[in-house]
Amino acid sequence: MSIQVFCDFDGTITNNDNIMSIMEKFAPPEAEEVKNRILSQELSIQEGVSQLFQFIPTNLHDEIIQFLIETAEIRNGFHEFIQFVNENNISFYVISGGMDFFVYPLLQGLIPKEQIYCNETDFSNEYITVNWPHPCDRLCQNHCGLCKSSLIRKLSDTNDFHIVIGDSITDLQAAKQADKVFARDFLITKCEENHISYTAFETFHDVQTELKHLLEVKL
């Protein structure tokens, strides 16, 4: 049995949700209703996020990148946490509902690209189009967009110990199949609604402390 860590990006590795930051800065007011319908699960994540990015003109590409480079902050303790998982030969994957054009640059030098799974974007038309290279498998019918539970099944064995770290509705399906969940913000609410056991965290120092204890118990 090996330990596999599957970590969200927006609002988890970064302090803020970068998609929401982009929408607040660059999208028209109508985007707010779409966001609320995603959170209430009236819209699937795939449908809702596709609609959100259709509000954003592609000619803002460079401006958006610069905005995120200036404003996105990596959560406290993440650098040390990555060093810890590497030293302990723990498999670590970023499974993000975020977009390639900002996830890769913000994680450059921290996480190898082959350990990052995110959505792809097309800037060839007037508005941003989202492509979905990691859809739901036959065991998930939630139209997740990037399906985190499907990726967990693809990247690990059933007898592995699965750890999920996340903050929002996009992490719920993954949390349902995890052996250990680290949750913050809206994911805490969803875990409680669905009777999913979780450990709350604010920094990756919190996660590292708990994971270190878990390793000691399992060893």
From Swiss-Prot:
It catalyses: 2-hydroxy-5-methylsulfanyl-3-oxopent-1-enyl phosphate + H2O = 1,2-dihydroxy-5-(methylsulfanyl)pent-1-en-3-one + phosphate. It comes from the Bacteria. The keyword Hydrolase applies. Disulfide bonds: none annotated. This is 2-hydroxy-3-keto-5-methylthiopentenyl-1-phosphate phosphatase. Dephosphorylates 2-hydroxy-3-keto-5-methylthiopentenyl-1-phosphate (HK-MTPenyl-1-P) yielding 1,2-dihydroxy-3-keto-5-methylthiopentene (DHK-MTPene). Pathway: Amino-acid biosynthesis; L-methionine biosynthesis via salvage pathway; L-methionine from S-methyl-5-thio-alpha-D-ribose 1-phosphate: step 4/6. Gene3D superfamilies: 3.90.1470.20, HAD superfamily/HAD-like (3.40.50.1000). The lineage of its organism: Bacteria, Bacillati, Bacillota, Bacilli, Bacillales. It comes from Bacillus cereus (strain AH187). Belongs to the HAD-like hydrolase superfamily. MtnX family. InterPro entries: HAD-like_hydrolase_phosphatase, HAD-like_sf, HAD-SF_hydro_IB_MtnX, HAD_hydro_PyrdxlP_Pase-like, HAD_sf. Its EC number is 3.1.3.87. The keyword Oxidoreductase does not apply.
